[in-house]
């Protein structure tokens, strides 16, 4: 499999340190509110990557954190008159509900930042001892950016350009607490009304960037195979993670980096100020979760993706085609007689090959979806004449590749009441006797009972309305 490595800006063969075992870290949410559809993209994209790696027989150690201490969380708690902890616990539960609704597998480990304070302080000490960090006069601890000659290698930004062109950095000198405006906090001195922990530098709390470094090192080791997140995290978050991790550990932090593109709304950047801000829960309440997952797979993960109501409705309709196809396969396999055509075996093998070729090419989910719908077309064309073995082969391939994409997870088999079965049999008898009036009347009865009947070459097929 080849992936686009942000570090080198090119596609590379994705080779883990240990053959058959991938160690992956994905930046998780800051749980101060419901996640929006932009937050859902990395959640779905990298869950799909994990599923594919596992499908190909690999073991994946997948860590995705919960940021439960942050300026936004503190501010939210102050606005509500509650605590940061209460806010974090409430919205972590809502996040997990959304993640489950989107059919994202649970991480191997899902660490919280507040549970890793000692590990954070261990890295802070390593940085100070090696001269890469210093304690400011107020008790803040800053990373000394100029001590790292490789700083900027992920974002491909030069430190001199950052300092001269970034007003925000210049404004962060904070009364000469920093040696350099580009230096960033790895530990923040306590402020009144904010949560704080004991440290050798006085009461305080961790900086944002060091939380992920500590959780990654604790659960995956000093060098991981892949670090993932949204493009907005490349700088400063991921750049700073690399700097502090590699300076503390003395080795490569992450061998590969993957970043997903932004979500726009009606071709405009999603933002609260433009009133085009949608939470996952907002969209799911109207369309369900599964169309959101399907939508995220319709474009290459590195490309910007434009959210519109028309597109999400189109995804919902496409999912209905998939569900209908699978129901038709189930129906065909329940019949007593089958055809003799074996073509579907060949078409199922072709679909698997096309699917894997697409996924091996930097997680090309649009082409992978195309392979799924090519198989749907063949199933719809050939199921009436296919052998039982060919139908079973097609069903297995269909389930495999839709499962890797995390789709069709709401599939359920409706129990058919005896009354409905009896009416279907009576209707079939009426049709055989060419008693069309009775057949139509029974169809109307079935509709009133909440069932639709479709006449096929294999016989009448029922579906719940």
What spans do the regions from the language model cover?
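N-terminal, positively charged nucleic-acid-binding surface of large information/translation enzymes
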Residues: 8-13, 17-105, 458-462
């Amino acid at each position: 499999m080849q992936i686009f490595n942000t570090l080198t800006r090119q596609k590379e063969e994705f080779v883990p340190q240990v053959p058959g075992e991938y160690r992956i870290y994905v930046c998780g949410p800051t749980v101060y509110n419901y996640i929006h559809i932009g937050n859902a993209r990395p959640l779905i994209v990298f869950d799909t990557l994990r599923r594919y790696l596992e499908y190909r027989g690999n073991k994946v150690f997948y860590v995705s954190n919960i940021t439960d201490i942050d300026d936004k969380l503190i501010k939210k708690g102050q606005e509500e008159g509650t605590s940061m902890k209460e806010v974090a616990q409430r919205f972590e539960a809502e996040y997990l509900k959304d993640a489950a609704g989107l059919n994202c597998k649970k991480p191997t480990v899902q660490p919280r930042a507040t549970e890793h304070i000692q590990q954070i302080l261990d890295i802070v000490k390593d940085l100070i001892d090696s001269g890469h960090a210093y304690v400011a006069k107020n008790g803040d601890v800053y990373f000394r950016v100029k001590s790292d000659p490789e700083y900027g290698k992920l974002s491909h930004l030069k430190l001199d350009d950052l300092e001269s062109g970034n007003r925000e950095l210049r404004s962060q000198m904070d009364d000469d607490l920093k040696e350099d405006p580009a230096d960033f906090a790895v530990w923040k001195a306590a402020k009144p009304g904010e949560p704080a922990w004991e440290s050798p530098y006085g009461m305080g709390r961790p900086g944002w960037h060091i939380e992920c470094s500590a959780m990654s090192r604790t659960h995956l080791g000093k060098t991981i195979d892949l670090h993932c997140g949204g493009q907005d995290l490349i700088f400063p978050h991921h750049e700073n993670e690399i700097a502090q991790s590699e300076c503390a550990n003395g080795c490569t932090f992450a061998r590969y980096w993957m970043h997903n593109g932004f979500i726009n709304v009606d071709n405009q950047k999603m933002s609260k100020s433009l009133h085009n801000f949608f939470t996952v829960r907002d969209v799911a309440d109207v369309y369900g979760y599964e169309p959101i997952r399907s939508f995220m797979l319709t474009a290459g993960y590195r490309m910007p993706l434009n959210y519109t109501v028309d597109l999400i409705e189109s995804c919902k309709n496409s999912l209905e085609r998939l569900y209908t196809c699978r129901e038709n396969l189930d129906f065909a396999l329940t019949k007593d007689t089958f055809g003799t055509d074996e073509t579907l075996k060949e078409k199922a093998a072709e679909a698997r090959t096309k699917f894997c070729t697409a996924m091996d090419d930097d997680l090309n989910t649009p082409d992978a979806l195309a392979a799924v719908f090519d198989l749907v077309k063949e199933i719809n064309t050939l199921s009436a004449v296919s052998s039982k073995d060919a139908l079973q082969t097609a069903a297995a391939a269909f389930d495999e590749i839709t499962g890797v994409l995390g789709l069709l997870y709401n599939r359920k088999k409706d129990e058919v009441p005896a009354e409905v079965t009896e009416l279907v049999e009576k209707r079939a008898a009426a049709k055989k006797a060419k008693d069309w009036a009775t057949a139509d009347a029974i169809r109307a009865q079935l509709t009133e009972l909440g069932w639709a009947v479709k006449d096929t070459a294999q016989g009448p097929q029922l579906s719940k309305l």
